Amino acid sequence: MTQFIEGKWVAGLGHEVTSINPANQEVIWNSKTATPEQVSQAVDAARNAQFDWFMLGFEGRLAIVEAYRDQLEANKAEMAEVIAQETGKPQWETATEAGAMIGKIGLSVAAYHKRTGTSESETPAGRAVLRHKPHGVVAVFGPYNFPGHLPNGHIVPALLAGNTVVFKPSELTPKVAELMLKLWEKAGLPAGVINLVQGEVETGKALAAHPQIDGLFFTGSSRTGHILHQQYAGDPGKILALEMGGNNPLIIKDVADTKAAVHDIIQSAYISAGQRCTCARRLYVEKGATGDALLEQLVAAIKQIKVGPWNAQPQPFMGSMISETAAKGMVEAQRNLLNLGANSLVELTHIEAGTGLVSPGLIDVTGVIELPDEEYFGPLLQVVRYSDFDEAIKLANTTRYGLSAGILADSREDYDYFLARIRAGIVNWNKQITGASGAAPFGGVGASGNHRASAFYAADYCAYPVASVEADAVSLPATLSPGLSL
């Protein structure tokens, strides 16, 4: 019983699907997918529950969301363990993700009041009141890299605003989603307010195309996001929020503390085995002896990175990629770059057949004429040597993406120069570019998103503004308009 529809756990009626621990091939979860008919049942359940959920009022909805927060707190160790088993991420990282899910509640409440609350003011025309109302039924598509935190970041603000949800998680991390719904159930969520449909592409297509959803919130690949964007282009009545990753640049310029710079490069490129949408994919290093010395330190540090299963002790920095297929894809990406003329500085290797375990790679692509503008979603960092700062910024902007970017530089003037010219939604200075604040918006431009930033700004796409001019009684104006007599 792995689908949650109208407050009941039911069996999927589609084909069998299995979730496997990518570090050891252990079966974590096995069930059947939701059919298109079951997707329709889930949407109908959400539709039937939506008005009552909205009319419960913010305080009533908040009480249930806070009860869910308490369930997360009580079960955070289990949540972290399930995330680790399904994704292959080390336990120190998944404990952080479980904690972020708890923290998201307070941030979402603050965002609701600041971004979409109610306000009023007196005007000559009457009392002007601004309110916000929910869209209705929204679909949430979750990714595999943060299977708890990222969908949680859509679901919580959507519910606070008064929407109901149909949640389709990644088929690679279904057990995390199942645990989330069990905690919502324990929190006393009314039937139909969240519905879970587990499945693969056909389940997602059925949900995305359903005529009775009012919006879709998506985190995932640029390819899928662009398909959804085209699909929704002819339906302006539906809200579409896309977060789609990037080919993110990091520039190094005149840094005295090279050890700290190496640390921030590693944290930017290799955390989560390179499977964060904000991970650095391109590293720009000055030509000459200073850049050579930095790269020498970086190569030595990369070779010391510990890689291992999610439960290894002592804990590794990098766990497994999400699957053996993903690991092989990174080996192939490296091969393609080498065939284009790149030079390997640290080879990315598939450590163990049958697993997603790979070692981190560093590859010099300076001078490669037709460098692919691709998001290689794994621990492979491309190095480009540059002659002057303007060249580095120009190269950094040579991408259709625009999610995150950063510069490590001791000069504030260099940062200001970079900030004014770089095109990205997240721009960091002397910090890893995988670091983002939940109290700030999170999103990119270009192929990285559609101007629907998430995190603190998720409240914006979960409700629409309703502007009213009000008076307590009907009254005649002091002076009638010309040509009128009453």
UniProtKB/Swiss-Prot annotation:
The answer to whether the entry has keyword Oxidoreductase is yes
Where does this protein act, in terms of pathway?
Amino-acid degradation; L-arginine degradation via AST pathway; L-glutamate and succinate from L-arginine: step 4/5
Q: What class of enzyme is it?
A: oxidoreductase
Name the chemical reaction catalysed here. Answer: N-succinyl-L-glutamate 5-semialdehyde + NAD(+) + H2O = N-succinyl-L-glutamate + NADH + 2 H(+)
InterPro entries from the UniProt entry: Ald_DH/histidinol_DH (IPR016161), Ald_DH_C (IPR016163), Ald_DH_CS_CYS (IPR016160), Ald_DH_CS_GLU (IPR029510), Ald_DH_N (IPR016162), Aldehyde_DH_dom (IPR015590), SuccinylGlu_semiald_DH_AstD (IPR017649)
Q: Which molecular-function annotations from GO does this UniProt entry contain?
A: succinylglutamate-semialdehyde dehydrogenase activity
Q: Could you tell me the EC number(s) of this protein?
A: 1.2.1.71
Look up keyword Transmembrane and say if it applies.
Answer: no
- Gene Ontology BP terms: arginine catabolic process to glutamate; arginine catabolic process to succinate
Question: Keywords on this record?
Answer: Arginine metabolism, NAD, Oxidoreductase
Q: Which residues bind NAD(+)?
A: 220-225
Tell me which residues this entry annotates as catalytic: 243, 277
| Database matches in PANTHER family | ALDEHYDE DEHYDROGENASE-RELATED
Q: Which family does it belong to?
A: Belongs to the aldehyde dehydrogenase family. AstD subfamily.
Role description: Catalyzes the NAD-dependent reduction of succinylglutamate semialdehyde into succinylglutamate.
Entry protein name: N-succinylglutamate 5-semialdehyde dehydrogenase
What species is this protein from?
Shewanella halifaxensis (strain HAW-EB4)
Q: Which gene encodes it?
A: astD
